[in-house]
Curated annotation (Swiss-Prot):
Binds to muscle nicotinic acetylcholine receptor (nAChR) and inhibit acetylcholine from binding to the receptor, thereby impairing neuromuscular transmission. It is found in: Secreted. Disulfide bonds join 24-45, 38-62, 64-75, 76-81. Expressed by the venom gland. GO terms for molecular function: acetylcholine receptor inhibitor activity; ion channel regulator activity; toxin activity. Keywords: Acetylcholine receptor inhibiting toxin, Disulfide bond, Ion channel impairing toxin, Neurotoxin, Postsynaptic neurotoxin, Secreted, Signal, Toxin. Gene3D superfamilies: CD59. Belongs to the three-finger toxin family. Short-chain subfamily. Type I alpha-neurotoxin sub-subfamily. This is Three-finger toxin W-IV.
Amino acid sequence: MKTLLLTLVVVTIVCLDLGHTLLCHNQQSSTSPTTTCCSGGESKCYKKRWPTHRGTITERGCGCPTVKKGIELHCCTTDQCNL
């Protein structure tokens, strides 16, 4: 718990030092929630979901990628909007 709190504080400080940058969740469905500051003036976060034989996979990150047919994509423009 302390590690997670420290990580969030560090990410917040880094984001504030760089000016207003977008903060997005960046984990896959099988991992614990994490966030990242988007670089290069990126202005969108995404959540991508697709079915597999073992269940639905969810991937999150910065940007708004092009996806193949059958993959659900949600792009958004506010901090941590891709949960």
